[in-house]
Amino acid sequence: MSPAPPPSRGRIRPWLVVGDLVVAAMWVCAGALVKLAVYGVLGLGGRPEADAVKVALSLVYMFFFAWLEGFTGGASYNPLTVLAGALASRAGPSLYLFAAFVRMPAQVFGSILGVKLIRAALPKVGKGAPLSVGVHHGALAEGLATFMVVIVSVTLKKKEMKGFFMKTWISSIWKMTFHLLSSDITGGVMNPASAFAWAYARGDHTTFDHLLVYWLAPLQATLLGVWVVTLLTKPKKIEEEADESKTKKE
């Protein structure tokens, strides 16, 4: 079964709030289950093949969530994805406000609910990966990783690639690359909702370190990434109009 075609851009779709909440809860549960399978069930902690198995399992559920996003018409587990989409669509302040003040809080609440459920069912999943470096080092790492991921994600959307497999494959491999590179520093989260949910479970969700590293840095990186892609990728209509006006002048 193929994903449903994406809805037209720039529309406020209230039903996505429920979809965001459910998908965000499912996402944190999926990530926790993969870690539990790799380090608990398979006992690969500290072994070189642990990362390979983790990547393979993660790619499977990343494809599932990409399909789920298309099937639901845009439900997402990551506030940065919603924010980047609203900014890149140029649909005006209403869509941006809907994303920032309705959809993103729903994703945060869904992530918290997911963490509570998975920890109640499987206490061995732990409380997530806390920041293991200084706050400024962590903010730089999380911001840079987010910036690189946003650039590729927004570019793929603007190019409107028709192949679901290839588009998802490129995006997933790119995300996993930067997740692995930053996993020993910040956990490689690149998802404020998920990071907040695990921090809430640990009780450090209101600290300055958490807000700077997992919220301010990735949000700024998202804004910068969307701006860079928008600057470098000129819409075809604008290019055609510029060519036509140039031809008329000649």
From Swiss-Prot:
The gene is SIP2-1. PANTHER family: AQUAPORIN SIP2-1-RELATED (PTHR47720:SF1). It comes from the Eukaryota. A motif (NPA 2) lies at residues 191-193. The chain crosses the membrane at residues 14-34, 55-75, 95-115, 132-152, 178-200, 211-231. Pfam families: MIP. One of its GO terms (cellular component) is membrane. Aquaporins facilitate the transport of water and small neutral solutes across cell membranes. Expressed in leaves and anthers, and at lower levels in roots. Gene3D superfamilies: Glycerol uptake facilitator protein (1.20.1080.10). This is Aquaporin SIP2-1. It is a multi-pass membrane protein. Aquaporins contain two tandem repeats each containing three membrane-spanning domains and a pore-forming loop with the signature motif Asn-Pro-Ala (NPA). Keywords: Membrane, Repeat, Transmembrane, Transmembrane helix, Transport. It is found in: Membrane. Belongs to the MIP/aquaporin (TC 1.A.8) family. SIP (TC 1.A.8.10) subfamily. One of its GO terms (molecular function) is channel activity. A motif (NPA 1) lies at residues 78-80.
